[in-house]
Amino acid sequence: MRTLTIEPLTKEAFAPFGDVIETDGSDHFMINNGSTMRFHKLATVETATPEDNAIISIFRADAQDMPLTVSMLERHPLGSQAFIPLLGNPFLIVVAPLGDVPVSGLVRAFVTNGRQGINYHRGVWHHPVLTIEKRDDFLVVDRSGKGNNCDEHFFKEDERLILAPHQ
């Protein structure tokens, strides 16, 4: 099994998979009589049809035992999915490029700085949320509507990956 190298999350490195939601290096303008900086359109919510709705939820995630065997990835073919950390803790991201099935050899892992969120583009393969802390909360923006919006792919045993603890 291949051990994934955990990369720091940057906009450039994550661009094939989605958007990094952060203020650092992002354009902004002043609103509210000059008392507020607006970092505008850091990500776009994608939905498949005009009947779909963008919704906001909170996910409360428990940490996984490390090292973690990455045996599956999921994707949301009908909409994007954003995770914004509410408690300021770094979290791990495991992704693979668009495709009918994820390719084990193309899987990448990232770690946020605790102030970054991410928005997976429609159809991007990813692991379910991976918190580093014992328990963590995330604001999630995704799609509600008709149709199955979650495909899962389980890797064959020889395709599985290892995610080691973040140092």
From Swiss-Prot:
It is an enzyme of class 4 (lyase). Its cofactor is Ni(2+). Keywords: Lyase, Purine metabolism. InterPro entries: RmlC_Cupin_sf, UAH_cupin, Ureidogly_lyase, Ureidogly_lyase_bac, Ureidoglycolate_lyase_dom_sf. Pathway: Nitrogen metabolism; (S)-allantoin degradation. Its EC number is 4.3.2.3. The keyword Lyase applies. GO terms for biological process: allantoin catabolic process; purine nucleobase catabolic process. It catalyses: (S)-ureidoglycolate = urea + glyoxylate. GO terms for molecular function: ureidoglycolate hydrolase activity; ureidoglycolate lyase activity. It holds the Pfam family Ureidogly_lyase. Catalyzes the catabolism of the allantoin degradation intermediate (S)-ureidoglycolate, generating urea and glyoxylate. Involved in the utilization of allantoin as nitrogen source. Homodimer. Belongs to the ureidoglycolate lyase family. This is Ureidoglycolate lyase. It comes from Pseudomonas fluorescens (strain Pf0-1).
